[in-house]
Structures are given as C-alpha cells and as structure tokens.
C-alpha cells in the first residue's frame, strides 16, 4: 500500500486517532507483536490513542516532532465525538509547526463515503481520504483498512494476519453441521445458557501477560457492544 510505504519512509512516529473499533483492534495487534523483530524496530513508533486523557494526551502531542510524525484519523461515521475532539485538539499544534499546504503529506483520514464532518475537514485541508467500507461495522473493522494500514506501517505482515484469521474461520465453519465440535459454538452456548437460566451475565477475560492487555480490552468492547444491549445479554 503506497500510503503505508510513505509513512514508513518519512516518519519516526505515527499517531493513530480513533476510539472503540477504530483503534482497539490495531492496538491489540501492535502490542501483541514481537517488538524485537527487525521489521518492527525499523518501523515508526505507533501511538494509538483511544481517548483524550488530559495528562497523557497533552504530554504526547507537545513532545512530537511534526515534521517527522504522521497522523491517521479514523471514524466510520465521520462524526465520532471522541475522535473529532482528538483531531481538533492536535490540529492547532500541528499548524504551529507546519504550513496548511503541508498537512496532506502527514495526515490521512479513514471514514465512510458521504457527507460527514471529518470528510469536510479533510477537504478543507486537501487531506487524502481512504473509504471505510460502509458494510463493515466499526467494531469488526480490524481486518479492513482501519486495522491493516496501522499494521502495515508498524512493520507487521497484513497478509499473514488476514490469512491467519481466515484459517480460524475455516476451522470453525468446517464443524458447522456438528456444533459440539466447534469450541466457539460451545462457548457461545454456555454463555447464553448461563445468562438465560442462571442470570449470570458477566463475561471475564483474564490476560496473564502485559502484551495481552489490549487484547482483553478489545475483546471487552467487541463482546459488550455486540451482545450487551438495553439491559439484556452479557457484558
């Protein structure tokens, strides 16, 4: 992908702005990776920001060299409040260091087609925009450009990651006629049974390694946002 190559060659740091599915999946992949591999060590450092905590946020954006920093802004709807706050907070800082006509070389936007606030802002500064597939929900977007662009920039192999995901799906679907042989189906049935029959609605995922902490947070968001609605289901 030309944009990933550009970010790898030009920048020392890359700031990923997003929340929920727009950032948790790529953060999990990045933090689970072997940071000692040559490809990752030679790639830019990713800063995947999921909120605007004043202390962490201000300290980060004030220390970055924006002539050597790329920014990717991700919002499926193009109007996600947290993501727009992130972008509108960092944009004035960048403009203190760069001319407006320089922004297009260091900022890329990912959002779905159509008229939305993020696309309007991108058009104002002539920023490149990649389409977020409208058919893919934000929380499931890690294997799309949303997750794979940061993955490529970080030095990971996006093709291998997607092939690995396909292998897991193939294994699950191979036992579709015998659900008892599919661990995912058994786990789902147990979870539903506990919730419906015993009112046990809390799902716990323990990460026994720091590298898996972001995986647990991503899982929590995927699970609760998908299955815990209107006081029903599990969280």
Residue ranges and their predicted role:
Residues 1, 27-70, 74, 79, ...:
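Glycine-rich oxoanion-binding loops at beta->alpha junctions
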Residues 1-11:
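Low-complexity, highly charged intrinsically disordered N-terminal segments
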Residues 10, 39-43, 66-67, 99-104, ...:
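Short helix-terminating capping/connector loops at secondary-structure junctions
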Residues 13-17, 70, 108, 204:
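Conserved beta-strand elements of the Class I
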Residues 15, 19-26, 76-84, 113-116, ...:
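Gly/Ser/Thr-rich loops at beta-strand to alpha-helix junctions
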Residues 25-30, 58-61, 82-87, 117-124, ...:
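Short acidic, glycine/serine/threonine-rich loops at helix termini
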Residues 96-235:
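Active-site phosphate/pyrophosphate-binding segments
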């Amino acid at each position: 992908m030309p944009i990933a190559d550009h970010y790898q060659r030009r920048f020392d740091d890359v700031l990923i702005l997003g929340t929920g599915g727009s950032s948790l999946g790529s953060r999990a992949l990045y933090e689970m990776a072997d940071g000692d591999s040559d490809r990752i060590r030679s790639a830019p450092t990713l800063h995947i920001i999921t909120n605007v905590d004043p202390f962490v946020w201000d300290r980060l954006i004030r220390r970055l060299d924006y002539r050597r920093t790329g920014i990717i802004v991700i919002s499926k709807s193009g109007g996600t409040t947290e993501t727009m706050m992130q972008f509108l907070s960092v944009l004035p800082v960048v403009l203190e260091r760069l001319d407006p006509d320089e922004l297009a070389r260091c900022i890329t936007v990912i959002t779905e087609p159509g008229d939305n606030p993020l696309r309007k802002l991108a058009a104002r500064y002539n920023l490149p925009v990649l389409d977020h597939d409208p058919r893919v929900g934000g929380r499931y977007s890690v294997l799309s450009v949303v997750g794979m662009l940061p993955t490529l920039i970080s030095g990971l192999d996006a093709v291998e990651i997607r092939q690995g995901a396909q292998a897991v799906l193939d294994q699950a679907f191979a036992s579709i006629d015998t659900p008892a042989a599919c661990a995912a189906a058994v786990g789902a049935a147990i979870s539903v049974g506990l919730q419906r029959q015993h009112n046990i609605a809390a799902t716990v995922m323990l990460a026994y390694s720091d590298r898996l902490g972001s995986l647990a947070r991503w899982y929590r968001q995927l699970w609760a946002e998908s299955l815990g609605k209107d006081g029903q289901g599990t969280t």
